[in-house]
Amino acid sequence: MKHLSKAAVLALGVLLATAPVAAASGTDRQAAAPAAVSQAANDPSDLNPEVTDGSNYTGDPTNEAALVASEDQRLIQVRTQASIARWTGSSLNVPYRVASGTGYTLVLTARTKDYTMDDLLSLAPKTFVRQPDGSYLLSENIVIESGATLTLGSSMLLTVKMFSSAQKFVSIVNYGGRLNVAGSATAPVKITSWDVDHSTPRQITDNGRAYIRSIGGTVSIEHASFESLGFWSGRTGGLSMTGSDRPITGAISAAGAALAKHHSKNSKFPEVEKDAAGEPVPGAVLPSDIIPALEGEATNSDFSYVTASVVNTEITDNVYGVFLANAVGVSIHNVTADRSRMDGFVLHRNVSNATIVDSTARHSAVDGFRLSRSIRSVRLDTDKAENNGRDGIYIDGRALATGPSATGTSISSHGNDVVVINSTMTGNAHYGLEIRGGRSTTVRSNTISDSLMGIVVQDAASGVTVDDNHLSNLATQAIALRDGVTGGKITNNTVSNSIVGVYLRDAAADVESNRFTNITNHGISALGAAEISVRSNIISGSGPSAVDLKRAPNATTSHNTTSEWTVTKPFWQMVVSFFQPLTILWTVLGLILVFTALRGRRLKRTIRHPYADQAPMSTFTDLDPLQVRPDSLGPAGPEASSDVSERPRGRRSADEDRGQPGTFRPAEGGHVEAAFS
């Protein structure tokens, strides 16, 4: 190390320090606008226009996104200092301070003893100050390094106010260490942003706002409250436990020690095979034992996945109530997230073995509970999602990619083995519970009411079980499976006061032993060619039909009870059902026949011979030119002309013509002769 140039040391430090932060930003793609995040989760055409998608976020998108990037750079700078010190052999066994951005960052280095409130007062007498009301104002950033523990707690009520103004804000970042917020039932801990200009929690996020984040390491929070924290992104959203998909810098120290020890035992490096001229043989490599195998290093606690426990805690007016990514073994119990400016509880990426129990999300601008892609083995038990701007609970188990991608992400479903049980979803503007993709999701013994729709499963989700739920007062459909769902089980549910009880569209499912009451259109309706079984359901209400399977050719039905169903068709539905193509055609033909018959009766007053108008031409002339002799026509000249002109015009009867000069009558034998007087 002594022979390394300063430039090389700096380059190594930057490289090592950059890895975890860059990875964190890669897994948490929240630097994009919240509206874009929401749009990826939900097709806008599927949203009620009155339902928010996060685009009504009240901050300054341009400035806040820049501040997120600035925070990433600040953390890189802090880690770079630690890396340089480590590589140059300098000792950083005591806390130190780094100038960065608009202020300073106090770095708590590794030690066996916890850092406490007293330590902060001693280390930062000018930036961690006790206020007249007994609270403490923190006006510089804190970073907890790997191997260090910060415990915030007291024997009495403890309030920590984190500086937030139009000029700057502060944060507490646990970088692979341990953060304890240790309150009790009688002495809780309260942490809030603090607008020093107005002496209130900071409401405006345009210029950023104080936040708490853990990158790897461990977080333990009990009997605490957090208010008005965070801005713009998930990792700066208030109370964030993100982890990273790469090891924290300090995690490689053990490996370095192992390498150094191995090298001391083997001071002479082996050489590669050479040819007769002393040149290395092409393809020759060093022996495999030059570097020791480092099995088990990935389990080092300094690695990126965060572990967290949050118990008996209230969170109010954060951008994100609780934000998790790259987390394992997370336990959230009796936590309330109220008035979050985006989502209440977010499990964003690579979260597994997590439980959220007895917790409540209410009045969130978007979703109450949001489980994004790439999660598995998550359980929501006895939770409440009330009056949220979009879905009560949203679960996205779709694949992260549909084909080859720059990151080589798997195309398999990621939202697997999620259980939602004994929970309540009420008053949410969009759906009570929405599931998109994923496998083996179980929804059991929940109560869902007063939403646009109750439970919606779509986007080729497989193996979804919807069992023993109570759904009521849904504006359209209580349970809907659609768009490629397979292996669905809808059993033992109770549905009341909905237009449609169960709706299936291109979804394969068994609908069995459900009870439907006060349904106003169809108890069960299906369309598409998927295999559907409908049996042993009890359906009551009124509408066109209790079970509508006319558009589902592969559906089977048996043992359904519909005796209390009243078949009714509203006027407009009758009109629509009447005006079918064939109905219109036959109606037009019938009208034509009726019109023709009536017109014929009006014109046909007397009985006439059918050929009355087809008389021979001879009946219309006085002379037959074929039978008249020239000498029988009488004298020619003016007299004859005058005689002819003076004759009365028109046809005369045969009796009048008989015996008149110049007239003819038929002779016997059919010949015509001239008759003269």
Language-model regions, residue ranges each:
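Cytoplasmic C-terminal tails of single-pass
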Residues: 603-677
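Beta-strand/loop edge motif enriched in small/polar residues
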Residues: 24-357, 361-429, 476, 574-587, ...
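Acidic, aromatic-lined catalytic clefts of primarily extracellular/periplasmic carbohydrate-active enzymes
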Residues: 437
